[in-house]
């Protein structure tokens, strides 16, 4: 079997919490990304074998969110659809599985990606089915409980970011500087149209009529001057703030995958080939440093050296997640998140893994690079990574 290639890579803009996509269902965002990727690829929807979409906060979405998104995007009913939950790695894992399905001969064309509306995540009433016989009882936030809190001790993800800060002795000033640079890069990318090739506009019904949103919302809301004044977010005497953390967000991303020989037979010029992918797992409380292990494993699989990688997309769940590989592996900041990262753009958890790949493909094209690695940390102590090479 030949290489597996990315024929198209598209995403929606990223909406702020309760912002431009508030009220837009997760599958609707997913459908927009899927439809745009298919259109860009030139592959007929009737040829799609399977749709794989990551989604973490699936409560109250109805049955089979990926199936809903596929049907809304115009994928024929004959194509299968699977919803995948690997927390923040969901959107990237779908691409990894799509790659493997085609390699194994189990599928010919796979649409893979992720989608999330954190704004629409509901509150839940545990034990209500059996009844609470007396007294008050609490609603549980689906977003926090199933997306942002460690399942093993109930601690917020940001508390573990503080552990990584202590390990590497990163100062508050270093984290602020990183976050400020992320915002500056994102704002510059918006100003020069760097995201134009990857974002599809989403139409949203508002009181003023239908409005199209095609711009990431958070960078325009960021005030760099306020970043050094923010209070610690997770620990009284800590140094991780809202600015050096990713914001709660909504969005979706998707890619179209097929074999390189199949693309050639169809007359399609792919964007990139997938050279390899890797997973690294360790202690849940050290999920923040897991991308380092994933990068190591991926380099071994591909035979690449760090110097041969032109650009990295490392998800900024927290600034420290990207700063740790800079410190430990010696990756220059100039190669990481050249158009800004999640500290500036936001982190729709089920979509971010795919969003990184979409942005990496686009950034390599606009920055004259060839090889890139996308990686992100995952709650529970894991990380995934994908290596791509432009064609």
Question: How does the language model describe each region?
Answer:
Residues 1-61, 65-73, 80, 160-172, ...:
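Conserved active-site "lid/cap" helical segment
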Residues 1-24, 139, 224-289, 293, ...:
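Condensing-enzyme catalytic core mediating Claisen C-C bond formation in acyl metabolism
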Residues 10-12, 23-24, 29-31, 40, ...:
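N-terminal extracellular/periplasmic Venus flytrap/periplasmic-binding protein-like
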Residues 55-110, 151-157, 221-247, 328-355, ...:
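Conserved catalytic cysteine-centered active-site region
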